């Protein structure tokens, strides 16, 4: 799973979700964060 921080989501291949990834643990936190492209 590749996650890229972005400002907006305009690509149909991706779904925009509000999430962050803890850089130390790699744990995804869906409750807080910046918009990202996430492969679905």
From Swiss-Prot:
Cofactor(s), by name: Mo-molybdopterin
Molecular functions per Gene Ontology: oxidoreductase activity
One GO term describing the cellular component: peroxisome
Catalytic reactions of this protein: N(omega)-hydroxy-L-arginine + 2 Fe(II)-[cytochrome b5] + 2 H(+) = L-arginine + 2 Fe(III)-[cytochrome b5] + H2O
Keyword list, A-Z: Isopeptide bond, Membrane, Mitochondrion, Mitochondrion outer membrane, Molybdenum, Oxidoreductase, Peroxisome, Ubl conjugation
KW Mitochondrion (keyword) present: yes
Comment on bound cofactor: Binds 1 Mo-molybdopterin (Mo-MPT) cofactor per subunit.
Main location, first listed in the record: other
Cell location: Peroxisome; Mitochondrion outer membrane
Topology of the protein relative to the lipid bilayer: Peripheral membrane protein
PTM remark: Ubiquitinated by PRKN during mitophagy, leading to its degradation and enhancement of mitophagy. Deubiquitinated by USP30.
Highest taxon, organism lineage: Eukaryota
Residue location of crosslink Glycyl lysine isopeptide (Lys-Gly) (interchain with G-Cter in ubiquitin): 10, 31
Keyword presence, Ligase: no
Enzyme Commission number(s): 1.7.-.-
Expression by tissue: Expressed in the liver (at protein level).
Record function comment: Catalyzes the reduction of N-oxygenated molecules, acting as a counterpart of cytochrome P450 and flavin-containing monooxygenases in metabolic cycles. As a component of prodrug-converting system, reduces a multitude of N-hydroxylated prodrugs particularly amidoximes, leading to increased drug bioavailability. May be involved in mitochondrial N(omega)-hydroxy-L-arginine (NOHA) reduction, regulating endogenous nitric oxide levels and biosynthesis.
Assembly behavior: Component of a complex composed of cytochrome b5, NADH-cytochrome b5 reductase (CYB5R3) and MTARC2.
Protein name: Mitochondrial amidoxime reducing component 2
Classification of source organism: Eukaryota, Metazoa, Chordata, Craniata, Vertebrata
